[in-house]
Regions:
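Low-acidity, Ser/Thr- and Arg-rich intrinsically disordered low-complexity segments
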Residues: 4-26, 30
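HhH-family (HhH-GPD) DNA N-glycosylase catalytic core used in base-excision repair
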Residues: 30-357
Length: 357
């Protein structure tokens, strides 16, 4: 499901249009909500290779809420590929089909002002509308529960992003398999900073964060076994990533397929199952019906929110979401964003740092 657990932030820092008076909790962050401060005057960029684009959503699009739309792409508060700036901008790096690129996007009234750098700049700007949810249709969602109606009303800026890239969501999703989110975030951060490339852009003097572009498939394939171990990644997850990067081109082709066929292609790779494929397709395709199954917490949260059943399993969750066929992922995200989760009654999953073995 979009987003993962992160520390609580101070109440009143919610994204514009997303109920800014509500605190950001672990559950709402898991729903894909990244606090983005109100926009301020932008700093001078001062770089010759910058490309720019302004995009205004069509009438009826709703408010442009960068924190809600782009939040699912962040892998922890120190993600080396994603950062929310103090000036209200969002920075994101991407290994595009044309090469590395850096995107900075900022809401300016009803419009989005974007700048991009690097070989992938043109591709990033071409894909900007899809990234900001232009291909999503929130009107197709009809709430059948009071909780969902309330949350949808409070989050009018919720649109599903479509990145058009597979590997950038697949690798961190594999790292999140069967471990705590802190462990997965740490592994992603260490591996990207060590084997990725510094993000193209104007540099820190223009307010650019210290960002990296994820490694190319060949670079992932050449990471030594001891470096996976040092990052806390066990052999099973490392082997899954290595199998995936060997067929990276075929996996990236999945963005041209309908979501069910795309998931089937991803699941041909041993180690990639329904949980991982759903996490990827939600982001790469902006697919509103790709609900995550096999998750440790989501069935309990959905069951508790819709039926008061904190012990619901996947089958019960899917039954409860049947009225939202075609929009089940959106329904699950709204539930997570509502913060309506069962009280914890057992300890958190124990963290196991295999790098110390």
């Amino acid at each position: 499901v979009a987003g993962r657990f992160a520390p609580r932030s101070t109440p009143g820092t919610g994204a514009p249009g997303g109920g800014s008076g509500s605190p950001t909790t672990r559950t709402t962050v898991r729903g894909g909500h990244v606090p983005v401060p109100a926009a301020r005057r932008a700093a001078a960029d001062g770089t010759a290779d910058m490309r720019q684009r302004s995009w205004t959503p069509p009438e009826g699009h709703g408010p442009l809420d960068l924190g809600l739309v782009l939040g699912p792409l962040r892998r922890g508060p120190a993600d080396p590929c994603f950062r929310a700036g103090r000036d209200g901008s969002v920075w994101r790096t991407c290994l595009t089909p044309l090469g590395p690129g850096t995107l900075r996007v900022r809401a300016s009234g009803p419009a989005a002002e974007a700048q991009a750098w690097g070989p992938g700049a043109a591709w990033l700007l071409d894909e900007l509308p899809a990234l900001l949810g232009a291909e999503d249709d929130p009107a197709a969602f009809v709430p059948r529960h009071r909780l969902l109606a309330h949350c949808a009303h409070r989050r009018p800026g919720l649109r599903l992003t479509r990145t058009g890239r597979v590997l950038e969501s697949l690798i961190p999703s594999v790292l999140e398999q069967k471990v705590t989110t802190d462990e997965a975030y740490r592994a992603w951060r260490l591996l990207v900073r060590r084997y990725g490339v510094p993000a193209p852009g104007p540099g820190p003097e223009a307010g650019m964060p210290d960002l990296y572009v994820m490694p190319e498939p060949r670079t992932w394939a050449l990471i030594p076994s001891w470096e996976w171990h040092r990052a806390g990644v066990d052999d099973k997850r490392a082997a899954t990533i290595l199998r995936a990067v060997r067929v990276a081109r075929r996996l990236e082709e999945a963005v041209t397929m309908p979501p069910p066929q795309a998931r089937a292609r991803l699941e041909l790779v041993p180690g990639i199952g329904p949980w991982t494929s759903a996490e990827v397709i939600q982001r790469s395709h902006g697919a509103p019906d790709e609900v995550t199954v096999g998750d440790l917490h989501l069935p309990h949260i959905v069951g508790y929110a819709l039926a008061g059943d904190r012990d619901a399993d996947d089958a019960a969750m899917l039954r409860l979401l049947e009225p939202y066929a075609g929009q089940r992922h959106r329904a699950a995200r709204l539930i997570l964003l509502s913060g309506h989760a069962p009280p914890r009654r057992r300890p958190k999953m124990r963290r196991t740092d295999i790098s110390k073995w």
